[in-house]
Amino acid sequence: MTRQLDLILKEGGANYDWKTEFEVQPQYLDARGKGWLAHGLEELGGKGSFPLFEKIQIDFKIGRTLILWDDELVFNRYRGITFRSEMYEEFQFTFLEGHKRLCRTYEKEALKTGMQQRLWVGSPLATRIFGQPSEPGDFHGVGASGWKLLAYNHLQVDLLSRIHGFKLIRLSPYETLMTAGSLKRLDQLLINPKEEQRSMLYGWLMRKLG
């Protein structure tokens, strides 16, 4: 999907960076921010000190705006838990309410790919922090340690992007746009879009930049 978005931005003449990163400055994280991350980890059932990114991978960077594509796996109960953080009351994110709703609605879609061992269990870091996961598909007990780490990492990206002075836009497959008189999902529109659809999508992205 990001490849198609890259082509749309390029065709529209946008000045942007694709598949880039920014380096985290740990000194920007104050006591309040550390508290938000520690509490987020605890709410997900994590133990120990919270891990902090050294660099954050970004799909697109346009000026001081970062754009990330969130795939189906993102939208689950654990990401929903992170959205309860006081951080989201302190900072405004345009995607917040929509993403909260998607987490409540589309967990079954996350399960279609997310029960794979590498995703459900996650990395050794995931099991160290959250413990040994339950069987794939079973949310009792520990549940999905890999999913939990992913949710925590997204909380971390939201916070770190803001304290580094960036605006963050998160795109989802489930966003709907009006085209040719009907609503279509973003992921469907990005499959071989026609010229007029590419132009419409470019305009839509530019409006999101504000």
Which residue ranges define each predicted feature?
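Nucleic-acid endo/exonuclease domains
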Residues: 1-210
